[in-house]
């Protein structure tokens, strides 16, 4: 198991904001203490500006250095452009590791799946998974799927990949919930699985299984996973019902696809996040 992380991603914070450095630091500590899963630690690779511009406008890239909040959820931080690029570099490094047959997880912040071509929003500044998916397509992968199990709809990823013939997007998320999108399938390649608040755990898992089966029918050559852990039953930002065992099962299910796969951290705001990530990684690794 390869974990990609960087101290820079714990260098910024905002008082009272749920997307905080401890999400990373406490998970690192948990993963370093455990002995069941051998881990190789590495740093992000370089961030390719051309890769960013496949997914985002130059206006957004320029906007990242202007000292003005994007919205109340997405404040400006000094050097946020550098931190966002480090997350992109980790996503691109994860893609390369998956191509080489490794099981890999990017333990980085900021997350990315709400960022659209022209807008940073929802704690997200650049869309890491969309950038990596388009990079894969640009470098010879014929079909790329993005599987997003964050409890919030990946509106940014959907908008960037919409109607791209080489890509498919699958999002399983709570609705109603932020950002208020994802109620139906969109275009020819974006498939949404909205789940009502407080859906019973078994029903939620059934929806996840249906989405995995649908993804398999697309026959991708690469899968990028937006791994959000906020559908957890005790996450403060939603009303999900999943437990650690369900994230383990989901990791197993994705592993069983038998397709090169990379996972990038998105949401998850409970103090139990390290346990949830470890459970998912064990499933991915077949432990």
Range-by-range predicted roles:
Residues 1-287:
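HDAC/HDAC-like amidohydrolase catalytic core signature
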């Amino acid at each position: 198991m390869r974990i990609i992380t960087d101290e820079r991603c714990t260098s910024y914070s905002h008082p009272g904001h749920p997307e905080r450095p401890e999400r990373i630091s406490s998970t690192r500590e948990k993963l370093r203490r455990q002995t069941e899963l051998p881990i190789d630690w590495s740093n992000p690779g370089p961030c390719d500006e051309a890769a960013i511009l496949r997914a985002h406008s130059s206006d957004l890239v320029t906007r990242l250095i202007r000292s003005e909040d994007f919205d109340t959820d997405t404040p400006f931080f000094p050097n946020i452009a550098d931190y966002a690029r480090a997350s992109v570099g980790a996503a691109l490094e994860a893609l390369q590791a998956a191509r080489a047959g490794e099981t890999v997880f990017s333990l980085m912040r900021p997350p990315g799946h709400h960022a659209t071509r022209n807008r940073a929003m929802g704690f997200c500044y650049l869309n890491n998974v969309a950038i990596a998916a388009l990079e894969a397509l640009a470098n010879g992968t014929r079909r790329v799927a993005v599987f997003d199990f964050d409890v919030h709809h990946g509106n940014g990823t959907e908008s960037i990949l919409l109607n791209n013939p080489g890509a498919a997007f699958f999002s399983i998320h709570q609705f109603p919930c932020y950002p208020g999108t994802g109620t139906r399938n969109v275009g020819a390649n974006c498939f949404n699985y909205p789940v009502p608040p407080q859906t019973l755990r078994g029903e939620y898992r059934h929806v996840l299984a249906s989405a995995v089966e649908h993804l398999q029918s697309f026959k991708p050559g690469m899968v990028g996973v937006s791994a959000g852990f906020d559908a957890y039953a005790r996450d403060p930002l939603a009303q999900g019902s999943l437990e650690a065992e369900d994230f383990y099962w989901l990791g197993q299910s994705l592993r069983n696809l038998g397709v090169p796969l990379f996972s990038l951290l998105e949401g998850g705001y409970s103090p139990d996040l390290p346990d949830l990530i470890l459970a998912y990684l064990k499933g991915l690794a077949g432990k």
